Amino acid sequence: MTKAIIRLENLEKTYRVGETEVHALRGVTYEVHEGEFVAIMGPSGSGKSTLMNIIGCLDRPTSGRYFLEGEEVSTFDRDKLAHIRNRKIGFVFQTFNLLSRTTALENVELPLLYSNVSSKVMTELAKKALASVGLGDRIHHKTNQLSGGEQQR
């Protein structure tokens, strides 16, 4: 069996809304192994976004443990979490979250600003990424000049 890339142990997340406690996650235990594709599905309000925010290091669990590649993420400081978001975890969102006044190239370069690479390397990497999804000839197009499918890529 392949190793667990993501391991969640008894994750809980509780939000306080005024006087009310909202239990978004209760006792989630799960593993995602190398090479697996996973879909998180459920009705509205079932905790999908909360779970994804924790896995994506955008939020912390109230209790429980989260391991990424064997390291306990729940204890990391902000800088280490930012590094994980920049280098290890990525999401495909339902909405594109692109900056409308920038080009496809600039949108792809944006996350690389946090990676401490030169602007030349940043541009080369962004061009390579765009070419790999069939958008090499669209790098200078603004987001509103791209089709929905092109924006998603």
Regions inferred by a protein language model and the residue ranges of each:
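ABC family nucleotide-binding domain
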Residues: 3-153
